[in-house]
Amino acid sequence: GDLTATLAALQRHFFTGGDARPIIAALQNRNRILLQVRALADAGLVRVGPRGLDGLPRAQGAYASRFIGATEKSSFNLFTQNPWYVGKLAGSAKLPTLRRLIDNQQEFLVAFEEIIQRPHEQEAVLRDMAVRCLASA
């Protein structure tokens, strides 16, 4: 990731009076999807390439039964997502490792807890979170 651009975007967001919770929620949702993509890629069921995600229908055939009853769109179920969106989210660059994605999810949780404790320091909390997530990427 681009730490400088991320920090600048956070500054713009909070300059206009933004709140941290929607950012954290969006990051958690996207990260949940990437965790599932990474697990499927590591299992050899999908491949992230220049045209998005290849093999998603095959992976769905293998694992959709694990999500019985989960038919509404949700970041908890990769197979309810628009395949085009998943491909764009995964991008054509190398996916982060599963460990990095899990660590990021933990950082998002820590940041959410911190903004509850320090509601007037939301920008600083997200800035610190971004540094922790992107500096080690």
Describe each region flagged by the PLM.
Residues 5-137:
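C-terminal alpha-helical interaction modules of replication/initiation AAA+ assemblies
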